[in-house]
Amino acid sequence: TAGAGVENGVLLTTGSTQTDSSATTSASVDEGAAASGTAPAAYLEVISLASGEATVTVEDSGNNVSFSTKAVFTSVTGRTSERVTAAGSSGRYLRVVTSGTFSNLVFVVGFSRG
């Protein structure tokens, strides 16, 4: 958004890019504590998608056992990027889940607690 400040956050994907060959639940990232930021946001950058359609979701949890959906990106069929806002506070643990029928999704997801 023009005029918006910098949003600091954390990468939820492994390394500079992550490649999922099919639907995957990634390992969670421990943020150390729950946060009650005023405007949490998630960021998706799809570098490539070999075939199919993928949906990328960010989930959060207070105990690293029971996760709930925090943010859902628009389904992707190729190279794209998107920023979505998430309501309310976010749990201590965050993870990325990919779903759909696809092959070789190369992507990056970041999350800012606001």
Which stretches of residues belong to each language-model region?
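Signature of extracytoplasmic/envelope-associated structural regions
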Residues: T1-G114
